[in-house]
Amino acid sequence: MMKDILDVHTHTIASVHAYSTIREMAEGAKRHGMKLIGISDHGPAMPGTMDDMYFCNFRVVPREAAKGYGIDVLMGAELNVIDYAGSTDLCAKWLSYLDYAIASLHDLCITPGTREQNTSALIGAMRNPK
């Protein structure tokens, strides 16, 4: 049986539908034998989440909050694709503060398109340097 050693699609209390802090997530990861977690809160186009300045603070997030649990932490974002060209909701400046990014189509941020439009949007988002 395979064992998960990392999870990089996670949300903290900064995302409207999540309930844990970074420290609580590190505790849970340790309990499950993981080695790495990635914090990927939603970008600002998602209603009820943080604005872009939240991601600016990733330069100073105390990653050591998870070190006591033997867990490495990456700071990322779940970017919202906002058009069919693949534009996302964080500018290059804020993206530079991230370790990684996930691009997702959410119907709260973009009107669902055809299969071709959605594919074009995701391919465009993959051109992002993160």
Give the residues covered by each predicted segment:
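Short, contiguous clusters of charged residues that form electrostatic/catalytic patches at enzyme active sites
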Residues: 23, 27, 120
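Non-catalytic positions within long, well-ordered alpha-helices that form the structural scaffold/packing
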Residues: 26, 30, 126-127
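Short acidic/polar active-site loop segments enriched in Thr and Asp
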Residues: 35-36, 40, 99
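Glycine-rich anion/phosphate-binding loops
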Residues: 16-23
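Extended substrate/RNA-proximal surfaces in nucleic-acid metabolism proteins
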Residues: 43, 47-130
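Catalytic phosphate/metal-binding cores of nucleic-acid and nucleotide-processing enzymes, i.e., regions
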Residues: 2
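Histidine-centered catalytic micro-motifs
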Residues: 5-16, 39-43
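Conserved, mostly hydrophobic/aromatic
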Residues: 9, 29, 101
